[in-house]
Amino acid sequence: MSVRRLYVEKRQGFDIPAQKLFADLKELFAIEGIEQVRVIRRYDIEGLTDAEYAQTKPVVFYEPPVDVIYEEELPEIANARVFAVEALPGQFDQTADSAAQCVQLVTQKERPVIRSAKSNCFNW
């Protein structure tokens, strides 16, 4: 069982956090030149079999009608600056803990190791 990386992004129209961040940067901080902001959630998942991963992916990690997923790598994002924010070692990661609890409920097995981060992409 290897570590799987899953990126989840809200589809256009459902990307409220990205829209809010874009508005804040333009209006509150008066940052000029930003054309688009994308917020992408990253999950590193360890301890699941292929079947368990396939079973829990659309139930726990994303909503198929609302989200777009990328497995293992993000596609090329032209003219973008990307930075990721994640919990430091020892800090509680509520998103990862909630996902691990949900996976445990679905699979009825031991809780997997999950880490999460948020990637912010800014197009200039």
Model-derived features with residue positions:
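Non-catalytic terminal accessory/regulatory regions of metabolic enzymes
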Residues: 1-124
